[in-house]
Curated annotation (Swiss-Prot):
This is Large ribosomal subunit protein uL29. NCBIfam families: L29 (TIGR00012). SUPFAM superfamilies: Ribosomal protein L29 (L29p). It comes from the Bacteria. It comes from Shigella dysenteriae serotype 1 (strain Sd197). GO terms for cellular component: cytosolic large ribosomal subunit. Belongs to the universal ribosomal protein uL29 family. The keyword Ribonucleoprotein applies. PROSITE patterns: RIBOSOMAL_L29. The keyword Aminoacyl-tRNA synthetase does not apply.
C-alpha cells in the first residue's frame, strides 16, 4: 500500500488497517513455519506496510 493512500485515511481507518496487516503477518509467519509459503517476499511487504501505518499513526497523534 502506498503512503499517499494511507495519508488520506482517518485514524480509525488506519487502526483497522494495522489490525488487518498484523493478522496477515501472523498468517504468513504460520505458513513459513509449516513450509507452505512459496512467496517469501510477502513477509517483507507486510512488515513494511505495518511500519508505514504505525509511522502515520504517530504523526497524526503528534499533530
Amino acid at each position: 500500500m502506498k503512503a499517499k493512500e494511507l495519508r488520506e485515511k482517518s485514524v480509525e481507518e488506519l487502526n483497522t488497517e494495522l489490525l488487518n496487516l498484523l493478522r496477515e503477518q501472523f498468517n504468513l509467519r504460520m505458513q513459513v513455519a509449516s513450509g507452505q509459503l512459496q512467496q517469501s517476499h510477502l513477509l517483507k511487504q507486510v512488515r513494511r506496510d505495518v511500519a508505514r501505518v504505525k509511522t502515520l499513526l504517530n504523526e497524526k497523534a503528534g499533530a
